């Protein structure tokens, strides 16, 4: 029987499947951070259980860390306690930890792939909704809750029901200045923020195959923002080139064996999907969100829609509420909207390719008066690579703040946050009410669009560079 990539990955990891029970899957990799793990470790301790396979669990500190200092006390007592608990738990249970002073420390969904911890064909879980990022490598990766974190620590398994399958094909070539962020925002704009609920989504098509691994990670990172359980891209030569030689990647003969297996990880030509969505890549323009979920998005050359334009009463009410929160009027263009802050970073867009794209826009320009712009690399290795290329100097000379690795302003769990009423051009993944700080207003964009907004003090269409001041 023909199978989709998701079905192949799922079936390869079944430990136990019996009638009237949710199948039990084996988990190859478990990623842990300081926020969703303390109660799970406490549960193990209370029950007297060890971590079943500590060598398959990797931990880092990212959500609560300061991006201005390595001082564990910098972000307050709760952050300090959570990080201290993670250090204690990893030491006690024998888990590898990339702590604040480790050169590999960074955002969990950045360090997994760059260290080769993430490999094609794996099942990967983390107590974080954006675990879908790792699906860019053809691995089945999804976020789990704290009780499930404990279950995986204790057994290296997890009960997981089969999901429906969705194929999203992006046909043709994208235009100039169009990035993976624009592609995925355009997809979510078409499906809506709940269009993928109950599905595992496989992204394919010429435009997807042309993406770098960084771009594919951006794409899969936001699969959750359309409601999907996970996102997938079939591994190919781009994947293998990226993986070769990384710390935890197979070496020598094992590498050749691994690649031979990885090449089988693709949907069969006659595989059946529950739903198919097609997008014409040539029609995708630079995207900017206007509302309070990622599906409320428009092309930069479009006007903000009126609530009356939505036939669905729920969508209409959501649009009315979003416009009120964002203090925007229907019918205007986002190029007319001034911004206060710019955030370039997050597990969506903090990799070296993202920073290069932003630096290319920033070079030779200055951040607009009254705008604060921060650039936060996703990991220690990304920071080191960017500094070796001189990107930090480009940003600093342009008036951007160059920070230390961490989740930063993606979420209001550290010192980087918006004040009430502040408007931010952000390369992160969520524009919910209060996501970046109570009363803060978030517009999701690509790194290049964010850098251009910082320079101009408002959004511009980066396809027309003459707009850059």
UniProtKB/Swiss-Prot annotation:
Pathway(s) served: Amino-acid biosynthesis; L-leucine biosynthesis; L-leucine from 3-methyl-2-oxobutanoate: step 2/4
GO molecular function: 3-isopropylmalate dehydratase activity; 4 iron, 4 sulfur cluster binding; metal ion binding
Protein name in UniProt: 3-isopropylmalate dehydratase large subunit
UniProt keywords, alphabetically: 4Fe-4S, Amino-acid biosynthesis, Branched-chain amino acid biosynthesis, Iron, Iron-sulfur, Leucine biosynthesis, Lyase, Metal-binding
E.C. number: 4.2.1.33
Cofactor note: Binds 1 [4Fe-4S] cluster per subunit.
Physiological role: Catalyzes the isomerization between 2-isopropylmalate and 3-isopropylmalate, via the formation of 2-isopropylmaleate.
BP term (GO), one: L-leucine biosynthetic process
Classification via NCBIfam families: leuC, PRK05478.1, PRK12466.1
Subunit structure: Heterodimer of LeuC and LeuD.
Cofactors required: [4Fe-4S] cluster
Top-level lineage group: Bacteria
